[in-house]
A protein has these predicted regions:
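Ferredoxin-reductase
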Residues: 39, 44-121
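Surface-exposed loop/turn and secondary-structure junction residues enriched for glycine/proline
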Residues: 11-21, 29, 81-84, 89, ...
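Gly/Ser/Thr-enriched, mixed-charge loops and adjacent short helices
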Residues: 112-162
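Generic alpha-helix signal with a bias toward terminal, lower-confidence helices
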Residues: 20-24, 59, 90, 98, ...
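An N-terminal, well-structured beta->alpha segment
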Residues: 1-64, 70-71, 146-162
Length: 162
């Protein structure tokens, strides 16, 4: 892809048009490159990833995870969860960061996005702009991470109830 949709890198997340057929601004190719860029920028070796129910979320999540694992990051795949569940996973699981594939309050099914954490803190502001530069520059490290199925919603709900 010659031109990437840099306008999707916002102040607190990455958001844009994403259709279930793989078209739009946020494509599976974008998600793969984002996974590669996140691995390089954050330097994490273990990451939690969750997604919402939007039509585009399965493909975006699969390619994000592939980008992370191709860079040597092991991924705890949380499955379909809420954003709060991903944040909880970052606090309670042995991970160094997390990503939620969601466009939050933006319209379904035309939008999607990525909310990212380093450790327990959401990426924001200058960090997202630095990530954008890594995304654009390329030069990603190769590695071999694994995907671990790790449903976390029950643990999250139990923590809320307790």
């Amino acid at each position: 892809m010659g031109e990437w949709p840099v306008q999707c890198f916002k102040a607190y997340d990455i958001r844009g048009l994403a259709n279930g057929d793989g078209s739009g601004e946020l494509t599976p190719q974008f998600a793969y490159r984002l996974g590669r860029a996140m691995a390089k920028y954050l330097g994490c070796k273990r990451f939690a990833v969750g997604r919402d129910i939007r039509d585009s979320s399965p493909a975006l999540t699969a390619e994000l995870i592939r980008g992370l694992t191709d860079s040597g990051v092991s991924v705890l795949d949380l499955g379909i969860v809420s954003t709060g569940c991903v944040y909880h996973a970052c606090w309670t699981l042995p991970v160094e960061g997390g990503v939620m594939v969601t466009a939050s309050h933006l319209p379904m099914p035309t939008h999607n996005g990525f909310k990212m954490c380093r450790g327990t803190l959401p990426l924001a502001g200058e960090e997202i702009q630095e990530l954008k530069q890594v995304f654009l520059d390329g030069n990603f490290a190769d590695g071999s991470g694994e995907v671990i199925d790790n449903p976390h919603m029950d643990n999250y709900l139990k923590a809320i109830i307790d």
